[in-house]
Structures are given as C-alpha cells and as structure tokens.
Design a protein with these regions (language model features):
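Auxiliary Fe-S-binding modules of radical SAM enzymes
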Residues: 18-23, 109-176
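Active-site beta-loop-alpha junctions enriched in small/polar residues
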Residues: 34-36, 61-63, 79-81, 106-108, ...
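Radical SAM/AdoMet-radical enzyme domain recognition
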Residues: 41-130
C-alpha cells in the first residue's frame, strides 16, 4: 500500500476541476489511482469537461475495459506472471491501444519479460509505446535495469518497436 488509508480527500467533479484550474500554464493531466475506471461514469464526465482545455492521460491497471472513444491517451498496465494478477488482464485492451498510448510492463523476472514479449508478438496493438519498468521490493529493483536493458537488446521481436524504460524515481528514493 503506497499511502495510508486516511490520506487524500474525497471530492466531487466540480471540486476536482476547481483544483485543476488553479495550476496556471498546465496543459496536461494524468488521472491515476487506485483504479480510475472503477468510477467510470464520473471519470467520463470529468474527461468530457476537461478535454477541451487539457491533454488527458489515464493510467489503468489493465483489468477494466478502456474506452477508446474517449479523447484521452491511455497508459495500460499489463500484470505479468510474478504479480499473480496476469489472469485478470483484459486482453482486448491491448488490441485497441494506439500510437498515443502506452502499454506498461512491470518486470520482476525473466518470465515476466517473456510474458511481455509474447503479448507484443501477438500483435498487441497499433504501434503503442511499450514501457518496461523494473519491479521493486524493499526499496530495490528486483531486476537490475542493466539486465532488463540487455534482455530488450537481445530480443529480436522488439527490434523496431517503440520501447522505453520506465524508471519510477520515487521508488529509487524509497518515497511511497
């Protein structure tokens, strides 16, 4: 658990928008969670009200259907084998993401990497960015970034794809 249960503040859509507009010269918003799609109706209203003024991305855990018709970009997690959540992933999500979207893999071991390569090789979608992120345990990466880079470099199936390493700085700093 990244935060204490009593952290945060419950807000309605108008209150959220009032907070967002306080940030001058801000044109991009990322909505994350928890899982934003658990409040789908409210999320859709928020997106509709903000999308004329802001570029919006939504980070989701991959277990709920994404809404491709929404004017947003998606960051869709794919939970690999070591997470124990692989069976909860909705495979159709990975077929509808496109060039403005990201599929993110959290890698804890070589099997996780192979899960990611398998999904990608099945023609997951139309040219998204594929982000590989090392899993962390006790404030340290379970897979060293250099090892992850080596796996990526050696995997022919990834050769011409848009691949990034997603390093979550707050985890290196042991902040949540």
């Amino acid at each position: 658990q990244a935060q204490s249960p009593d952290s945060g503040k419950e807000m309605n859509i108008d209150e959220i928008i009032n907070e967002v507009v306080k940030f001058k010269n801000c044109y991009r918003i990322t909505i994350t969670g928890g899982e934003p799609l658990l409040q789908e109706a409210e999320l859709e209203e928020l997106v509709n009200r903000l999308s004329m003024e802001y570029d919006i991305s939504i980070e989701t855990n991959g277990a709920h259907p994404i809404k491709k018709s929404w004017p947003v970009s998606w960051v869709v997690d794919y939970k690999c084998s070591s997470s124990g959540m692989k069976k909860k992933m909705l495979l159709k999500n990975y077929k509808v993401v496109g060039t403005h979207d990201i599929i993110k893999f959290v890698i804890g071991d070589k099997q996780d990497f192979e899960d990611a390569v398998y999904l990608i090789s099945r023609g997951a979608s139309i040219d998204p960015v594929y982000a590989f992120s090392p899993m962390f345990k006790d404030g340290k990466p379970v897979v060293e970034i250099n090892e992850l880079l080596k796996w990526i470099e050696e995997e022919e199936a990834l050769e011409y794809l848009r691949i990034v390493i997603n390093v979550q700085i707050h985890k290196f700093l042991n902040i949540a």
